[in-house]
Amino acid sequence: FIAEGDTCMMPLFQQFVNDASEFAQARRVHNSVLTLDSHCDTPMFFDQEVNLEHRDPKLLVDFPKMREGHLDVSTMVAYLPQGDCTPEASEAATAQAFKTLAEIEQRVAHAPGVVLAQHPAQLYRNKLEGKLSVMRGIENGYAIGKDLQNVEKFARMGVVYITLCHNGDNDICDSARRSSQRHGGLSAFGRDVVREMNRCGLMVDLSHAAETSFYDALQCSTTPIVCSHASSRAMCNHPRNLTDDQ
């Protein structure tokens, strides 16, 4: 009976051995490279009194989960849902963006072993020192409002990228969703925004952008563009995803 039981348990035991081996290999890989999450929506939950220093079931990313998953860098974003493009609504969006960015900084400052970062050298140094890095981005150029000077203000705060739009057209460009093709791509203001982002060293993020906006920005930008959270349309036919040409 014992021998037969041992035989029955061998496949399960072997699976545990294989899992442990794969985990050890994954740890070696993660220890040798910098792992970076380019877009994290955790700040959307700040108003629900979440604590990033503790595991929270509401969050996909918090600091304990980063450590357990060997994630070195998380780019936490100030997300702005698209609203009206009136001066008043635009100013409110700008104020909300500054508020969220400041709160990210405050929460990181109170977390042991977690630091804000902006440049690649900082990310690699923090990894060597065993620290987690948090970068900050903005999801929706609606945050810029109608004032181009806000681009430089965001850059001085340490923002690394701005996603030009979200779901719905704004003053900068047309969106891949809920679009009336208001501009037919980038607006004149949008071109100024891209050029100012280039000047200030901010990455131009084209996630959520319409194809026309994508190619206009690609033509306008003097630096490489990014899509921080998009996938392949050939794999999943969704307006938000990128064609093979893109």
Residue ranges and their predicted role:
Residues 35-42, 209, 227-230:
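Histidine-centered catalytic micro-motifs
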Residues 1-181, 237-246:
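N-terminal hydrophobic targeting/anchoring segments and the immediately downstream early-domain regions
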Residues 211-212, 232-234:
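Short, catalytically relevant binding-site loops at active-site mouths
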Residues 27, 146-156, 178-226, 239-246:
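Histidine/acidic residue-rich metal-binding segments in metalloenzymes
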Residues 80, 231-232:
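Acidic, glycine-rich active-site loops and adjacent beta-strand->loop/helix elements
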